[in-house]
Amino acid sequence: MNNLCTICARSGSKGVPNKNIKKIAGKPLIQHTIEQAKKSKIFSDIIVSSDCKKILKIAEKLGVHTLKRTNQLSKDFVGKVDVIRDAAIKAQKMLDKKFDNVIDLDVTSPLRQVSDIHNSFKKFQNGNYQNLITGCVARKNPYFNMIEIKKNVLSISKRTNKK
């Protein structure tokens, strides 16, 4: 079975600039996702789609395929499904291969376990699904989970009046 893993990593984050290459536990954030994808052994191919040369260089060093994303698909308002579709179509042409499944892994989930990937894929295979999205229960309203950096200090950007 040919399963394509797409990893979409845009450079233009407003909240945490260059977050996808910031080091977390000694590695660039994107490296965690690439390593998880490789360790899962579910994917015949892994492709990183990005508009950032630094991100693409990291991906190349880690031995995965890369795709330079167009400026049009790198804007703030572009939906992720459009980017995944573009990566899948271009990967099929580039690798001369038809994929049975396309699985996208978010860069911003470094705590994801390989077992999470396995369990999600098993659920997808055993169900009658066209799509499967993972998530987790938030401890508080996600609106209040947003952070920002000001003068090299990380803080919650929205606060309630509760004490």
Named regions from a protein language model:
Residues 2-49:
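N-terminal glycine-rich phosphate-binding loop and ensuing alpha1 helix
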Residues 110-163:
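Conserved core of the sugar-phosphate nucleotidyltransferase
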Residues 10, 71, 136-137:
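Histidine-centered beta-alpha loop that forms part of the nucleotide-sugar donor binding/catalytic region
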Residues 47, 53-102, 119:
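Short phosphate-binding loop-to-helix
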Residues 105:
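Catalytic metal- and UDP-sugar-binding loop of GT-A-like glycosyltransferases, i.e.
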Residues 30, 84, 113, 117:
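Aromatic/hydrophobic pocket-lining residues that form the small-molecule binding cavity
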Residues 43, 97-99, 126-130:
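Short, high-confidence coil segments that cap the C-terminus of an alpha-helix
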